[in-house]
From Swiss-Prot:
GO cellular component entries: cytosolic small ribosomal subunit
UniProt key word Transport: no
UniProt keyword annotations, A-Z: Ribonucleoprotein, Ribosomal protein, RNA-binding, rRNA-binding
Molecular-function GO terms, alphabetical: rRNA binding; structural constituent of ribosome
Lineage: Bacteria, Bacillati, Mycoplasmatota, Mollicutes, Acholeplasmatales
Family: Belongs to the universal ribosomal protein uS15 family.
UniProt key word NADP: no
Species the sequence originates in: Acholeplasma laidlawii (strain PG-8A)
GO BP annotations listed: translation
Listed CDD domains: Ribosomal_S15p_S13e
Record-annotated disulphide pairs: none
InterPro entries named in the record: Ribosomal_uS15, Ribosomal_uS15_bac-type, uS15_NS1_RNA-bd_sf
Gene that specifies this protein: rpsO
Pfam name, any one: Ribosomal_S15
UniProt-recorded name of the protein: Small ribosomal subunit protein uS15
Domain of life: Bacteria
Length: 89
């Protein structure tokens, strides 16, 4: 369920703006997107897991806020991230 060190490291390396960048909105959104996708798969088989469903909604809200911030700060980076992650915005 949780991200492994290797998968998180791969995501950070792919979306980092510079070496050692773990806090930029792009990296945070990419990690949240991966976690959201994993939770969606979990909830497909465990429909009545309401605790995980609440966690999913919280992660979606956090990602929405980060995307809103990125869109306001730099629209080009926002558009590139949306295209790369395959989000439908």
């Amino acid at each position: 369920m949780a991200l492994t060190k290797d998968s998180k490291k791969a995501i950070v390396e792919k979306f980092a703006r510079f070496a050692g960048d773990t806090g930029s909105p792009e990296v945070q959104v990419a990690i949240l997107t991966h976690e959201i996708n994993e939770l969606n798969e979990h909830l497909q088989t465990h429909i009545h897991d309401f605790h995980s469903k609440r966690g999913l909604f919280m992660k979606i809200g956090r990602r929405r806020n980060l995307l809103k911030y990125l869109r306001e700060q730099d629209a080009q980076r926002y558009a590139a991230l949306i295209n790369e992650l395959g989000l439908r915005r």
